[in-house]
């Protein structure tokens, strides 16, 4: 399918390859974090009846609250009440979806220290009962976003736990993951990669 931009230039939408999801070269909104970009994408999916996926609230225990005004309250002190699991969950095509989103300024690899053991265990538990889990990683300096299947994530995590390398090379994301390129709506079309995962179940 061909698209004509206001300048008169033309662009074509490449076919999706097995290794990546290719979209027209549209850049993300300046200053937005990956979380904000995903929240906007999920809002689009929800408003169009495609999927119901939300950011999980972080569980906190409020300790001290001030009331400078009767109609307003200010939280002065709070603690994380328990370890959070992953960032997002919801339902798509009748499947339970659960995933985490991370950013890194590293240009050659993704440090596994960005994950915690309870997050990995949570995703493993979800998959045991039929859930679909994955991670979305943004290499900020490269402005590249990838969806990586948990099979590949777990392989590197388990290797790290046994003395292996402590990061996932960029080449693994390029060869085994799905590259997600920005488009108009949704901003990050990650469900196209999830479609490929579902097809291979």
Curated annotation (Swiss-Prot):
Q: Where is this site: Transition state stabilizer?
A: 102
For this entry, the protein name equals Holliday junction resolvase RecU
Can you name a GO cellular component term? cytoplasm
Q: Which organism is it from?
A: Pediococcus pentosaceus (strain ATCC 25745 / CCUG 21536 / LMG 10740 / 183-1w)
Gene3D superfamilies the UniProt entry points to: 3.40.1350.10
Give the cofactor note text: Binds 1 Mg(2+) ion per subunit.
Q: Which residues bind Mg(2+)?
A: 85, 87, 100, 119
Which lineage?
Bacteria, Bacillati, Bacillota, Bacilli, Lactobacillales
Membrane-spanning ranges: none
Show the disulfide pairing. none
Protein's gene? recU
Cofactor(s) listed: Mg(2+)
User: Which family does the record claim for this protein?
Assistant: Belongs to the RecU family.
EC nos: 3.1.21.10
Q: Known HAMAP family for this protein? A: RecU
